[in-house]
Structures are given as C-alpha cells and as structure tokens.
Amino acid sequence: MKRVWMLNHYAQEPGRPGGTRHYSLARHLRQHGWDATIIAASVEHKTGRQRLDAGETQKVESYDGVRFLWVRTSTYSGNGFDRIRSMLQYAFNVPRAVRSTELEAPDVVIGSSVHPLAAWAGARLARRYNVPFIFEIRDLW
C-alpha cells in the first residue's frame, strides 16, 4: 500500500466546522489502495478548541480509516501575532511530531498552501524521506 502525507495546518476531522477537503481526498485515495495521513494543527481554527491534553505534543487519531496527526500549536484569535506564532509552531513542530510517532515513511508528501509555512514543512519532510513533493496551491494570497 502506498502512503501519502498531507500537510494542512487547518484540516478538520469529519463533523467539525471548517474544511474537510483533505479528509474527503484521503477517503477517496484509500479506496484506491493508498494509506493517507493528514498532518494538522492541534487547534481548531474556527473555534479555538485545543485537541491535545496538557503535556501532549502530538496525537494520532483515525476517522473512518483516515489517520490524523495533530501537532501542538497554541491558541489564537484573529489575524494578529498569535496566529503567526501558531503558523511558525506548526512549521517547526511537524518534523519533530513525525519523528515521535510510529508513522511509516511516506511515498509522497503533499503540502497545502493554506499558509506558505505549511507547504514549506511538507517540502522539508519530502526532502528528508527522499520522496516526491506536491505543492498544492490553494490561495495566492
């Protein structure tokens, strides 16, 4: 089975407010023999809900066979400094979180440009694992 890692800071599990596009893509890929992991921030963008308990730096959960790796970021509201800090935390915590889990190495990494640092984190992982990188441009800002 081929493995794909999808990096999207704001990805959502099913049933939550916000974008579930990568979850839908992962379910579709699963029907075609791919194992997908979505790597997202621990803080839910729309509500500010923290998915991790105190002391946790990452957590793996599955929804309908789609794996999510939640990476610790801090809460924020609005578009100020705290949100930028969350973006930086995501970009720098993703490689550490991946190393701390038992995820099998990917065959391809997709970095979504929900903000440039998310895609940059994906490019770093692809380089580390020597696999192709797909830069998903979603918003040209």
Task: Label the model's feature ranges.
Residues 18-19, 50-51, 82, 121-124:
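Short amphipathic alpha-helical segments
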Residues 12, 44-46, 76, 117, ...:
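Surface-exposed, flexible loop/turn segments at secondary-structure boundaries
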Residues 2, 63-70, 130-134:
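Short coil-to-beta-strand
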Residues 1, 33, 105-106, 130:
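A general structural motif
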Residues 14, 84-98, 106-129, 135-138:
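An aromatic- and histidine-rich active-site surface loop
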Residues 66, 138-141:
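Mobile beta-alpha loop/short-helix "lid" or hinge segments that flank ligand
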Residues 1-64:
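N-terminal subdomain of nucleotide-sugar transferases
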Residues 38-101:
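A conserved catalytic-core segment of Leloir-type glycosyltransferases
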